[in-house]
From Swiss-Prot:
<feature type="binding site">
    <location>
        <begin position="15"/>
        <end position="20"/>
    </location>
    <ligand>
        <name>ATP</name>
    </ligand>
</feature>
<keyword id="KW-0436">Ligase</keyword>
<dbReference type="GO" id="GO:0019856">
    <property type="term" value="P:pyrimidine nucleobase biosynthetic process"/>
</dbReference>
<keyword id="KW-0479">Metal-binding</keyword>
<feature type="binding site">
    <location>
        <begin position="380"/>
        <end position="383"/>
    </location>
    <ligand>
        <name>L-glutamine</name>
    </ligand>
</feature>
<feature type="binding site">
    <location>
        <begin position="187"/>
        <end position="192"/>
    </location>
    <ligand>
        <name>CTP</name>
    </ligand>
</feature>
<keyword id="KW-0067">ATP-binding</keyword>
<keyword id="KW-0547">Nucleotide-binding</keyword>
<keyword id="KW-0665">Pyrimidine biosynthesis</keyword>
<dbReference type="Pfam" id="PF00117">
    <property type="entry name" value="GATase"/>
</dbReference>
<dbReference type="Pfam" id="PF06418">
    <property type="entry name" value="CTP_synth_N"/>
</dbReference>
<feature type="binding site">
    <location>
        <position position="14"/>
    </location>
    <ligand>
        <name>CTP</name>
    </ligand>
</feature>
<feature type="binding site">
    <location>
        <position position="470"/>
    </location>
    <ligand>
        <name>L-glutamine</name>
    </ligand>
</feature>
<comment type="pathway">
    <text>Pyrimidine metabolism; CTP biosynthesis via de novo pathway; CTP from UDP: step 2/2.</text>
</comment>
<dbReference type="InterPro" id="IPR017926">
    <property type="entry name" value="GATASE"/>
</dbReference>
<feature type="binding site">
    <location>
        <position position="72"/>
    </location>
    <ligand>
        <name>ATP</name>
    </ligand>
</feature>
<dbReference type="GO" id="GO:0046872">
    <property type="term" value="F:metal ion binding"/>
</dbReference>
């Protein structure tokens, strides 16, 4: 079957939840037996978000094949079973970079390179490539209609709709319908103006998703339909909800999936949302609560840890617990002391870069180890736990990472200069390598040691998890740290890189070099997070 395309745009203001709405629609269509994929087109000029500040952009989501992508791809993977790849996210910077590379190579035979047709053709070709092999491809355009940055993407999608045929394409526009308390009613004018903006560039939306803090009344929906040239049944109300996992059922209750299947002439069964109903039941009926202290350096923007936040919630679902996250700035641990860590049932130190606040993270690992508080370290969270153990248990008092101190006496963590990728190829890096796109990225195999907590949790000898780092445990000094009692319980496929460590004689102290949050989903959870949250609950009984 030829691929059908749903193009998702946003209007009026940003941050309305295009990604969540698109992923929720994808979940319904997948529940109808369709093979669905999703793409995100980002208008910024960065080649990828890998070097962007987490406090500006939010987290960088890493795909199975090692692409550093927008956090919306994390939403996509949490809502549907399809795994995202480097083909599912591209930016203006990546498009221009490829077009310029082709021009230098002579592919355009001396033509004058222009936005139309060369940039738009490259966009179309990447959309078609990313959608190949699926029944439905949902393509989200970042930004807001009217932004100058998104114009080439919108023009490319307009052309693609003409070339593929309108019977196989659908434009879905998400817009704001604000409630004005002084007037006591919702206002449709912003939506009308947003659609007018879209029409001015040649795109007539087929479906309107109306974001509001309440359900849009029938009269206003009819008004929007009339003035925006959209069937009334295609004006969908999307109100604020307490959980994003309620949205698939909310969209289905208004017949959005039926409208789309009829539009594409798809003969498929009704959506079976029983798995999502189970998720909502678990979420609404917890048997207890745990408080997790997340100690990081980007805590002013929780979206910087989006996948970690969601993975903790998923672990709560698996344990029938409500998980409350207490965000703690690691610099506060340095300046105010470990008192700021009191009152939590478990401590999680997520990934990060740079030396700001790192001593606070090391103090946090020490506090968790000495006070027998469940600890989960991820990426840098493993490295600081290793440094802390080396300093305070193994007696290597000046132990550090060369990322933070190049002249320390005991560089127990250092730059990885060589590693084996998932395909078995050897990759190399040096201090002179570029900052962007030079980390150990994507899924890598890990061998778990017999008798370890990690082996017990995963129930397997070999696992595969995603990485994003350029520093690792220094094997030269590793014997001294292990001799002091620290257990290395996970190693890379070639046995050269430390992937998991555990502290013995502790209720639950596990730290990993990889990012388990990227593979956690609301339906399946993740064994490390589930084990950590259970240990946090058990800690309350002490």
């Amino acid at each position: 079957m030829a691929t059908n395309y749903i193009f998702v745009t946003g209007g009026v203001v940003s941050s309305l939840g295009k990604g969540i709405a698109a992923a929720s629609l994808a979940a319904i269509l997948e529940a109808r037996g369709l093979k669905v994929t999703m793409l995100k087109l980002d208008p910024y000029i960065n080649v990828d978000p890998g070097t962007m500040s987490p406090t500006q952009h939010g987290e960088v989501f890493v795909t199975q094949d090692g692409a550093e992508t927008d956090l919306d791809l994390g939403h996509y993977e949490r809502f549907i079973r399809t795994k995202m790849t480097k083909r599912n996210n591209f930016t203006t910077g990546k498009i221009y970079s490829e077009v310029l590379r082709k021009e230098r190579r002579g592919d355009y035979l001396g033509a004058t390179i222009q936005v139309i047709p060369h940039i738009t053709n490259e966009i179309k070709s990447r959309v078609i490539d990313g959608a190949a092999g699926h029944d439905v491809a949902i393509v989200e355009v970042g930004g807001t209609v009217g932004d100058i940055e998104s114009l080439p993407f919108l023009e490319a999608l307009r052309q693609l709709a003409v070339q593929v045929g309108r019977e196989r394409t659908l434009f879905m526009h998400l817009t704001l319908v604000p409630y004005i308390p002084t007037a006591g009613e919702v206002k449709t004018k912003p939506t009308q103006h947003s659609v007018k903006e879209l029409l001015s560039i040649g795109i007539q939306p087929d479906v309107l998703i109306c974001r509001s803090d309440r359900m849009v009344p029938p009269n206003e929906r009819a008004k929007i339909a009339l003035f925006c040239n959209v069937p009334e049944r295609a004006v969908i109300s999307l109100k604020d909800v307490s959980s994003i996992y309620q949205i698939p059922a909310l969209l289905k209750s208004q017949g959005l999936d039926d409208f789309i299947c009829q539009r594409f002439h798809l003969d498929c069964p009704e959506a079976d949302l029983s798995e999502w109903e189970q998720v909502l039941y678990q979420e609404a009926n917890p048997t207890g609560e745990v408080v997790i202290g997340m100690v990081g350096k980007y805590t002013e923007l929780p979206d910087a840890y989006k996948s970690v936040n969601e993975a903790l919630k998923h672990a709560g679902l698996k344990n029938r617990l409500s998980v409350q996250i207490k965000y703690i700035d690691s610099q506060d641990v340095e300046t105010k002391g470990t008192e700021v860590l009191e009152g939590v049932d478990g401590i999680l130190v997520p990934g990060g870069f740079g030396n700001r606040g790192v001593e606070g993270k090391i103090l946090t690992a020490k506090y968790a180890r000495e006070n027998h508080i469940p600890y989960l370290g991820i990426c840098l969270g493993m490295q600081v736990a290793y440094i802390e153990y080396a300093r305070n248990v193994a007696g290597l008092t000046d132990a550090n990472s060369t990322e933070f101190d190049r002249t320390c006496d005991y560089p127990v963590v250092g730059l990885i200069t060589e590693w084996q990728d998932a395909e078995g190829n050897i990759e190399t890096r040096t201090d002179a390598s570029d900052l962007g796109g030079t980390m150990r990225l994507g899924a890598q195999q890990c061998h778990l040691m017999e008798g370890s907590k990690a082996r017990e949790l995963y129930g397997a000898e070999t696992i595969e998890e995603r990485h994003r780092h350029r520093y690792e445990v220094n094997n030269v000094l590793r014997p001294q740290v292990e001799k002091a009692g620290l257990k290395v319980t996970g190693l890379s496929a070639d046995k050269k890189l430390v992937e998991i460590i555990e502290v013995p004689n502790h209720p639950w102290f596990v730290a990993c070099q990889f990012h388990p949050e990227f593979t956690s989903t609301p339906r399946d959870g993740h064994p490390l997070f589930a084990g950590f949250v259970k240990a946090a609950k058990d800690n309350q009984k002490k």
